[in-house]
C-alpha cells in the first residue's frame, strides 16, 4: 500500500532526524510536526497541524511503520520509525540507500547530482557515480523503491522518484494533463490574436472610409 503525502513526509522526517539529530530522536508530536513543516529542505513546503501529523502517525502505526516510545519518567509520547533497519522491519538498507530514500521522500524527484549535493548531512557520497550506483540498486529491488523518470526537454539529467508513496501516481497524472493544458493555452492565445487582428482590420477600414470621404 502506497503512503499518502502526509505519511511520506512523516517517515522522511523520522529518517532524517534519526541521522542528523540523534540526541532528539525519537520525536515528540510537536517536534515531528515542526520537522514536517520546515521551510528548508522540503518540497513541497507543508503546513500540517498536530492533528494532521497524529492522523498520519495513527495510519502508519496500523501499517507497522512507526512505533511509540515513552521515556522513563516522561509523559511525552515520542515516535520512531520502523520503516527499515529495525528488528521489526522487513526492509534492510545500507546507509547510502537510506539517505537517498529520505531525500526523495522529503524533496520529491531529484537528479543524481542534486541528491549528492543535498545528502551531506545524511551520507558522504564520494561522487555522482556512487549515487547512481545506489539508485540503480534501489531500482532493481523487488519491489523497486525508485524509478528513473524520462529526461525533460531542455534538461541534461533525468530525475529519480521514490515508489513508496503516491508521488509517482500524482506525477503521472500531472504530466498527462500538461499537453491538454498547453493546448488550451495555445487556443486561448490564438483567439486573442484573431480578435486583435479583427480589431486592427476594423480600424483600417474606418481609416480608409475617412480618407475616401475626404477625396
From Swiss-Prot:
InterPro entries: DUF480, WH-like_DNA-bd_sf, WH_DNA-bd_sf. Pfam families: DUF480. Belongs to the UPF0502 family. This is UPF0502 protein Shew_1617. It comes from Shewanella loihica (strain ATCC BAA-1088 / PV-4).
Amino acid at each position: 500500500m502506497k503512503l499518502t503525502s502526509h505519511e511520506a513526509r512523516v517517515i522522511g522526517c523520522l529518517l532524517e532526524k534519526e541521522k542528523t539529530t540523534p540526541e532528539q530522536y525519537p520525536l515528540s508530536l510537536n517536534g515531528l510536526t515542526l520537522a514536517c513543516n520546515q521551510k528548508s529542505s522540503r518540497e513541497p513546503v507543508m503546513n500540517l497541524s498536530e492533528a494532521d501529523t497524529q492522523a498520519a502517525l495513527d495510519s502508519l502505526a496500523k501499517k507497522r511503520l512507526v512505533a511509540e516510545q515513552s521515556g522513563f519518567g516522561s509523559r511525552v509520547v515520542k515516535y520512531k520509525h520502523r520503516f527499515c533497519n529495525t528488528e521489526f522491519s522487513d526492509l534492510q538498507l545500507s546507509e547510502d540507500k537510506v539517505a537517498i530514500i529520505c531525500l526523495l521522500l522529503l524533496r520529491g524527484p531529484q537528479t543524481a547530482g542534486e541528491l549528492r549535493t543535498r545528502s551531506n548531512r545524511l551520507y558522504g557520497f564520494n561522487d555522482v557515480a556512487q549515487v547512481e550506483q545506489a539508485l540503480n540498486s534501489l531500482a532493481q529491488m523487488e519491489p523497486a523503491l525508485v524509478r528513473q523518470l524520462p529526461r525533460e526537454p531542455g534538461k541534461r539529467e533525468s530525475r529519480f522518484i521514490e515508489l513508496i508513496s503516491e508521488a509517482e501516481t500524482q506525477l503521472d497524472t500531472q504530466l498527462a494533463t500538461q499537453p491538454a493544458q498547453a493546448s488550451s493555452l495555445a487556443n486561448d492565445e490564438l483567439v486573442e490574436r484573431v480578435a486583435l487582428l479583427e480589431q486592427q482590420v476594423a480600424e483600417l477600414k474606418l481609416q480608409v472610409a475617412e480618407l475616401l470621404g475626404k477625396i
